[in-house]
Every structure is written in C-alpha cells, then in structure tokens.
Amino acid sequence: MARSFPPPSALRDFLESESAGGILLIFAAILAMIVANSPLATLYHDLIHAVTGPVLTDKLGPMTVHLWINDGLMAVFFLLVGLEIKREFVDGRLASWDRRRLPFIAAAAGMAVPAALYMFFVGDEPGLAQGWAIPAATDIAFAMGVLALLGRRAPTSLKLFLVTVAIVDDMGAVAIIALFYTAKINLLALGAAAAILGIMFACNRGGVKNLLVYMALFLLLWYAMLLSGVHATIAGVLAAMAIPFERTPGAPDSQTSPLHRLEHALHPTVAFAIVPLFGFANAGVDVRALGLDQLFAPLPLGIAAGLFLGKQIGIFGSVWLAVKLGIAGRLRGATWLQVYAVSMLCGIGFTMSLFIGSLAFPGNALLIEEAKIGILMGSLASALVGFAVLRLAPLHPEHNAVESASKGEIAVDGDVRDTSEAAR
C-alpha cells in the first residue's frame, strides 16, 4: 500500500517548507559570516575543506566536505528543482501557455537585464566576462523566507508569482550551467549517462513506481555526469524528468504518484538541511580587512548592481509592460507597489548565484571571494529594501476576499486557478 502523506496539496507543502527553510537559510548565512570573521575562522575553513575521500575523479581530486556539499548534496537540491518544474508544467501553475506567459516574460527579463548590467560594470576587465550569469539567479528559499516574515501582509498571488518566476528562473540557470559552465567533455562517460537516463525513462514507460529503483539509477547517473565533465548537479534535473507522475486536474494530489511522494519526502531534507548547509559552507567571507576599493571593484559592484537594480528593473518593467499591452492581467489582490517589492526580492540571488560563482571562476579563490561579496551585497540590499517596501505598502482593497479564495483553492487542490485579474 502506498504511504499517505499530509498535506494533500504539493503547492501548500512547497510554500510552507520554502518559507521555513528560507528563514533557516538566512540564519545559516549570518552564522557563516559571524564565524568567518571571528577567531574561529581558521577552524571554519579547515572544516569545510577537510578531505573526506575518496577520489571520484582526477579533476576534483580527493573529495572534501565542500565538494560533497556543492557537487553531491546540491544534486539532490537540483533533483527537487526538477520535480517542481515537472509538476508545475504538467499539472500546476505552468500547465498552460496562458499561465506560463507572465512568469516566462518576467523571468527572461529578470535574467537578461542583470546580466547586461553586470557586463556594463565589468566592461573589458580580463577574466570577468564569464561571471555574467551570477546575478541572473533568484534564491526562492531566501525570498520566501523574507515573505514569511511579513505574515498575512504578503498576498498569496505574490507568493505564487514569486514561485513561478523562480521556477522558470531555475530552468534558465540549469540551462546556463549545462551550456556555459561545462568542462571538457568525456564522451564515454556522457554516453553512459545517456544510457542510464534511457533506462530510467524505460522504467517509467514500463510502469515501474518503486522509488528505490529510480534513486539507485539516479546515483549512477550522478557519477556518470561527474565523470563526463558536465556538472554533476545536472543529473538531478534530468533524473526528475524520468520520475513517473500522475495528473490530478481539479483534484487533490495523488498519493500514489511517485513524483509527489518523492517531492514530499525531499522537501524537508532540502529545505532544512541541504540548502542551509550550502549557505553555511559558501557564505563565509572574511570582511575584516575589506576596503572600499574591494567593495567597489568591478566584479562585486557588477554582481550587486545586477541583483539589486537589474532584477527589479527587468521583472517589474516587463510585468508592467505586459499588463499595459494586454499580454497578461494584473495579479489578483496585489497593488503595483507590492509587485515592485517582490521584484526586488527576486534580486536575492544567494544559493544559485553562489553556486554559479564557484563555476564561473574555478580555481581562482580571489575572484570567488569577490563574487561572494557582490552576491551578499546585492542579496542583502534586495532583501532589506524589498521587505521594507512590502511592509509599508498599503494592502489592496480586495486583499481579504482574494486571500480567502486563494487559500481555499490551495487547501483543496494544488492546481491553483490563475491569480491574475485577467482570469476573473
């Protein structure tokens, strides 16, 4: 008999775990900064770079705690990202082109404008161009954590908008990692990965619903991708596409669907362990000897400007233009000022930005540290200003009525109806 799980809605579970996990991530990042700037700094760096073994590839050498987190545990994070993408596209908020239109427009502009701003600030500085994708990412957990601090003042339509934009943003980030941050390809290992993925899809087509089978194949796929030169975390997204899924339009999520079961099982681990661990292992930057010349160097300044200015300009500007041109409707129960504030919260890059930063400048500790400074500055500014604006923004006149309707939909069915005024 399939194991039952509460709650019935994957979307409600997602919103709750991302919010709570985001708050934990905030504390993990703050703790990392405190420790990295204290007498415990040496112990902190020795711990995260401690060799644990074994040697999985000649390129990586002996595995360290940091490598296990960034190349191992983050593959599980990307597996969950892939599951969320598949669920939303097949049976959720992105199941139709009408629903995809606004998040796609917002996410595309929200990646393009920050990247363009970054390139403007770094100019022709040698070796910095490959960091263009760092400010293009959004940390959904961190942003949802900030929204959670606002309680009922954050309209559900804004939370759902943030979720869908971030999911499309994640798709873009995955594509960027696969296309632009891939080392020399080992064709034999890549062929093995393709064969393993083919077996996973064959199991899906054959009606295999045992998650242990898929998880065993996922481990093999991860190792093959690690050997191939394509970043191993991509294995998570690819594996997610092969997990069987049962559509439940207009009804609660199926308790026998392998994808739903795996998503529910992974959410707590990813939100409360993997993402905070990643934040703690990657956010520790020693700023004790930091001068203004380092803060305003092209790399950190370009990243900070891309996250704080680029995201809000790209997302809010594209949403406003789409509504004015009749391409999409306004978000139900949300004012323009609230939409602007959430556009700022999308500038919290953190997890994905730190991850891309480590790929953009491999082996260059100085540039990676400068990238971290820019990510922390841009993310912190986006979080603080976005929170303040959303906290002070007047509520929409129909706030209470729209909230009651939205919560009823989420409680009964994860397939929430369109949250734009055009759908009314």
UniProtKB/Swiss-Prot annotation:
Q: Which domain of life is it from?
A: Bacteria
Name where it mostly resides: membrane
Q: Which GO terms describe its biological process?
A: regulation of pH
Q: Which residues form a coiled coil?
A: none
Signal peptide location = none
Keyword Flavoprotein tagged: no
Q: Which Gene Ontology CC terms are recorded? A: plasma membrane
Listed A to Z, the keywords are: Antiport, Cell inner membrane, Cell membrane, Ion transport, Membrane, Sodium, Sodium transport, Transmembrane, Transmembrane helix, Transport
State any single GO MF term. Answer: sodium:proton antiporter activity
The record describes its membrane topology as: Multi-pass membrane protein
Q: Does the keyword Cell inner membrane apply?
A: yes
For this protein, the parts annotated as crossing the membrane are 23-43, 65-85, 102-122, 131-151, 160-180, 183-203, 211-231, 265-285, 303-323, 341-361, 373-393
* Annotated catalysed reactions: Na(+)(in) + 2 H(+)(out) = Na(+)(out) + 2 H(+)(in)
Q: Where in the cell is it found?
A: Cell inner membrane
Function, please?
Na(+)/H(+) antiporter that extrudes sodium in exchange for external protons.
**What protein family is recorded?**
Belongs to the NhaA Na(+)/H(+) (TC 2.A.33) antiporter family.
Protein known as: Na(+)/H(+) antiporter NhaA
Q: Which organism is it from?
A: Sphingopyxis alaskensis (strain DSM 13593 / LMG 18877 / RB2256)
What would be the name of the gene that encodes this protein?
Answer: nhaA
